[in-house]
Amino acid sequence: MKVKPSVKQICDKCKVIRRNGRVMVICENPRHKQRQG
């Protein structure tokens, strides 16, 4: 999980979602998991 000030989609399978007021990227590639914070 990368924590970044700005999250971006890295590949076509990445999805930007909101969870508990946090913006997150989920992907089938675990290296692409990101959270804004």
Curated annotation (Swiss-Prot):
Domain of life: Bacteria
InterPro entries the record matches: Ribosomal_bL36, Ribosomal_bL36_sp
Keyword Ribosomal protein: yes
Coiled coil: none
Name of the molecule in the record: Large ribosomal subunit protein bL36B
HAMAP family hit by this protein: Ribosomal_bL36
Recorded GO CC terms: cytoplasm; ribonucleoprotein complex; ribosome
GO terms, biological process: translation
PROSITE patterns cross-referenced by the UniProt entry: RIBOSOMAL_L36
